[in-house]
Amino acid sequence: MKTAHEIRPGNVIMLNGSPWVVQKTETTRSGRNAAIVKMKLKNVLLDSTTETTFKGEDKMEDIILERLDCTYSYFADPMYVFMDAEYNQYDVESGNLGDAAAYITDGMEEICQVTFYEGKAISVELPTTIVREVTYTEPSARGDTSGKVMKPATIAGGATLSVADFIKTGEMIEIDPRTGEFKKRA
């Protein structure tokens, strides 16, 4: 059993007797009240999605499923195709990827973990750090250097995130795809 705080995108939880893939989590903390965790979930069996709110201490059954290390191969609308070390291919529906789809690019070399439920590939977990090229960002503004200055940037794959003010278009950066946060220049 895990608490709602410990659940991450890509985990599969049992809720009301059905397995659900966690696509997105967002934790909100307020001064007096306990933390609240909002989750976007996709039902593995019915292909339906829902957004649910939990208290941070709520216990959930995290289902242990078969996981394989795979690399991204290609996109065949609406399926992303991943390949394991023995050259077996696994199709994952784009709807099962959630926010991770924005970080998947042609030619990516990072090893991903594909999760299976009853023989069907249901989700993909990206590594904790990936390197991507910044395809567009505004030039840095002079004089705005007090504190940690961030600006929006678009990376290869289409995701938009906040990066440090000194990052320029064309540079490679390290990103945590689970949170969408900029880590450092690569």
Swiss-Prot record:
The cellular component terms of Gene Ontology attached to this UniProt record, alphabetical and capped at eight, are: cytoplasm
Keywords, A to Z, come to:
Cytoplasm, Elongation factor, Protein biosynthesis
State the pathway, as annotated in the record.
Protein biosynthesis; polypeptide chain elongation
Top-level taxon of origin: Bacteria
What the protein does comes down to: Involved in peptide bond synthesis. Stimulates efficient translation and peptide-bond synthesis on native or reconstituted 70S ribosomes in vitro. Probably functions indirectly by altering the affinity of the ribosome for aminoacyl-tRNA, thus increasing their reactivity as acceptors for peptidyl transferase.
Name the HAMAP family for this protein.
Answer: EF_P
State the family named in the UniProt similarity comment for this chain: Belongs to the elongation factor P family.
List the protein's name.
Answer: Elongation factor P
Q: Which organism is it from?
A: Shewanella sediminis (strain HAW-EB3)
